[in-house]
Design a protein with these regions (language model features):
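S-adenosyl-L-methionine
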Residues: 1-99, 127-179
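Local beta-strand N-terminus motif with an aromatic residue
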Residues: 45-46, 97, 177-180, 222
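Conserved class I S-adenosyl-L-methionine
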Residues: 96-106, 125
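Residues at the starts of beta-strands that form the adenosine-phosphate
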Residues: 99, 123, 157, 224
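Conserved SAM-binding loop of SAM-dependent methyltransferases across substrates and taxa
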Residues: 107-121
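Mobile active-site "lid"/loop adjacent to the S-adenosyl-L-methionine
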Residues: 184-213
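Conserved Class I SAM-dependent methyltransferase catalytic core
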Residues: 210-250
Length: 250
């Protein structure tokens, strides 16, 4: 997948300079904006573009767009505030300091929910291998604002790193984090028209989770490793897992 950087139509000089700066940082070619993205794709041979403008950058590929949003995080934190449980947060330590490493940042939903839940007693570091999702997420975190100031603060506290979790874990010292979390991309997602995420899927990394990676994660974490996957995932047959919980297909 070859990606370029461009701007909205009729961009002013400040937007163009920002796009050029980010293209250099990401190692993507900067392409001056033409008439249509379809024509630019045909002319350049690129498969998609990160587009910069007056608002947050977005990713475009084959007619599909992906913009920063936090999935169900707003709903989940609202429910937590009302005293209702969250399946992921219920697995985190109930008290004491807790530093979490989210190895699969993706849409930011899980990182944001955990960051809010751990306010005052923990920190979330998130990794994203895809340079596209990292860039959309980096800008999204920095510019995020919600009417709920506690959620705004939590999102902005997330420390997002552009990294492959395999390489990052290998470089970590023993017991560097309390909890390590994996939510790998489903290679065969359930198709729902109302949840069309083709732009996101086109940009995502699809690395397989192995027992070797989990053993490395166990070395790096002090308390537990959490994995979100389909119940039929073969990796759950390995005895490395001490607790498997299934609900609604996960």
């Amino acid at each position: 997948m070859r990606t370029g950087v461009t701007t909205i139509r009729h961009a002013d000089s400040s937007i163009i300079k920002e796009a050029q700066k980010r293209s250099e940082a990401l190692g993507f070619p900067y392409i001056p904006r033409g008439d249509t993205l379809e024509e630019m794709t045909e002319e350049t041979g690129l498969s998609g573009f990160l587009i910069y403008g007056k608002q947050l950058p977005l990713y475009w590929s084959d007619g599909e767009e992906y913009r920063f949003h936090m999935g169900t995080a707003v709903l989940r934190t609202t429910q937590l505030r009302k005293g209702n449980p969250d399946r992921l947060c219920a697995l985190l330590p109930a008290d004491g300091p807790c530093d979490v490493l989210d190895c699969t940042f993706g849409q930011a939903g899980d990182s944001s929910t955990m960051a809010w839940f751990l306010t005052g007693r923990g920190r979330v570091t998130a990794l994203e291998k895809s340079p596209i999702l990292y860039e959309v997420g980096r800008a999204g975190i920095a510019g995020y604002e919600d009417k709920d100031e506690s959620l705004t603060d939590a999102v902005r506290r997330i420390h997002l790193i552009h990294a492959d979790y395999r390489e990052y874990l290998a470089a970590c010292r023993d017991d560097a984090y309390d909890v390590i979390y994996f939510d790998p991309m489903f290679r065969h997602p359930v198709k729902r028209r109302e949840n069309d995420m083709e732009g996101f899927r086109a940009a995502a990394a699809y690395d397989s989770l192995t027992v070797e990676i989990l053993r490395e994660a166990l070395r790096v974490c002090r308390r537990k490793v959490i994995v979100k996957e389909r119940p039929f995932a073969g990796i759950f047959r390995d005895p490395i897992f001490t607790d498997v919980r299934m609900k609604r297909g996960q």
